[in-house]
Design a protein with these regions (language model features):
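Helicase P-loop NTPase motor core
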Residues: 1-61, 66-70
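Short, glycine/charged-enriched secondary-structure capping and boundary segments
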Residues: 50-54, 106-108, 153-155
Length: 156
């Protein structure tokens, strides 16, 4: 990323997080298709897609095993795994909440402390990769307890 440092934005509820994303996306105008909303899981992405579409925001899913149509209109929606290797003008990493980042299920599968540390490192790298997909702007959105991994992308 070559722009400003990541901006952490905290919201009291999911609805207010969605409202911020909707306003942000609409404010981008013609550049909306150069921005991407990134989530840790497909389930969270589905929840945002439904809420954004209800708010009148055009969206475009960047799907696994499919090339992105760069001329299709709409805010890009993708999981952290899917954005590897891609770049966008702007990124909003949504739902960067404890339990989602790191993904609690991923940590629960660890059989011992060493495996848990490795799972935490994988999650931290995934967040870092997502944050570095932006050329100009990264927003990290929280609507709950913040992820303990946030210092990995925004500093202490």
């Amino acid at each position: 990323m070559h722009g400003e440092p990541p901006e952490v934005r905290r919201f009291p509820s999911f609805a207010e997080e969605v409202a911020w994303v909707a306003n942000w996306a609409k404010g981008l105008g013609a550049e909306m298709s150069e921005a991407c909303l990134v989530t840790r899981t497909q389930a969270v992405l589905d929840r945002f897609a439904e809420a954004l579409n209800a708010a009148g925001v055009a969206t475009y899913r960047v799907r696994r095993n499919e090339a992105e149509d760069r001329v299709a209109p709409g805010l890009r929606l993708a999981t952290m795994h899917r954005v590897k290797g891609l770049t966008f003008g702007r990124i909003a990493i949504a739902d960067a909440n404890r339990g989602i980042l790191p993904l609690e299920a991923s940590l629960a599968e660890a059989a011992d402390p060493a495996s848990r540390r490795e799972a935490e490192h994988r999650e931290r790298r995934l967040l870092f990769v997502a944050a570095t997909r932006a050329r100009r702007e990264v927003n990290v959105l929280v609507s709950g307890d913040p992820s303990p991994l946030l210092p990995a992308v925004v500093g202490p």
